[in-house]
Structure formats: structure tokens, C-alpha cells
Amino acid sequence: GEATDVVSKEMFTAVSGENLKRLIDGGTIKSKSRLSLRPEGTAGVVRAVAQHDLVPQGGAPAKLMYAGPMFRAERPQKGRQRQFNQVGVECLGAEEPTIDAEAIIMLMRFYETIGIPRESMRLLINSMGCEKCRPAYRELVRSYMNEHADELCETCMTRAEINPLRAFDCKNEGCAHVMESAPKISDHLCPDCREHYEAVKAYLDAAGVAYEEDYKLVRGLDYYTRTVFEVQVDNGMGSQNAIGG
């Protein structure tokens, strides 16, 4: 619903932009009707798991998948559409590094199965830490950005107040240059997150899956913790070269 935090704050405002917010506030066909289009599948999966108690306390984790059309209201980058189809997998009720490695290995094997050559793909990985170590790191990045405010774009400085880690994803060349020298999350992980990240890499190594560590790889929603990953391929379509993650 509109009143729930994960939908109102993160999905509509942060992801879908002001255009969708105005649409929600102003109504649609009738004065009392509202239109809500899902930007991705994770929130719906989490809601279903909570509603139907699919992960009872002490029970086995729930491994689920979804597929269907998703929608984004912001102006799309080159090669990206406002409506697109997305396939995703979710595992809830487990924190082991084997789960993250399993998802990554499964994705890479899927791409190879449908004919994408392994040598044409780049697998990028990073750890975003957890609720124990990320807040302090986020403050370090915010302080760094404030020290370099005159070198960063307006969007980045707005993000500095809400989620400074998003500045690592800025496409502005000047901002990218400044953020190259920003504090790196790998230097500020707590012992548990460091052990988790090292285990994920060990499993990928054992499976023969090549990867590159990219400290600039972040996600804009607060529910992302620890391992994040992205698969890129040179598709000749412009800036949108990420095909999964």
C-alpha cells in the first residue's frame, strides 16, 4: 500500500521518480482511483512471504522466483525502456554465503545456456556491509562528499543527505573522478561481513566463475546488504549494458 515504508519511500519516491509521485497524488482516470505500477519484484515477494508465513521460525528458507512486466517512470537511459520484463530469484530465511554464490553461479550458467559467451560477460561483485558496519561507513562517505561539494554535481549532493553511496553510481565524469578517492567499503566491513564476502569469493573460485571486485558497485535501496553483483555485456546499445544482478 501507499502507506507502507518500503513502497512509499523506497519504491515510488526513490526509484520511480517525481512523475509517478505526481500520478499517485493526482489520481488517474477517476478522481478517486489510483494507479500503482511495480518497479521490481522483490517487495512483492517479501510481502507474500510475510503474509503467508512461508519461512516459519526455525524452518527451511524459501527459494522463490518471479517473472513479469515491470515499470519505471523516470526518463530511461539509452537502451532502457520504461516497461520491461524481469525474471528474478529470491531466497529468504538464510544468510549463508553459499546462497549468494548459488544465485551468482546460477545466473552465469543461465546466460551461457542461452548462448551468451562467457568471455563477453563481466561479473562485478562487491559487499555493501550490514546494519552494523554500513552506517559508520555511510557517514564517512557523506563527510568526504561534503569536503568536495564544489566538485560534485547537484544530484550527488542531494544524494549525500539521503543515501551518499549512490554517488558511486553517478555517470558524471567529474563526480566519478572525485569518488575514485572516496573511502572504500572493503576497508570498513565488520568481521562478520568480511568473512561472508571472502567465503562468497571462495565459492566462486571453486566453481570456476571469474569475477571482478568493484567497490563502486552499490544499490540505492536500504534493504540491500552484503553481497551485490552485476553482469555486464557489450551489447552496442549504449550506456545500458547491465543484463542482470
Regions found by a protein language model. Name each.
Residues 1-245:
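TRNA-recognition modules of translation machinery and tRNA-sensing kinases, especially anticodon-binding
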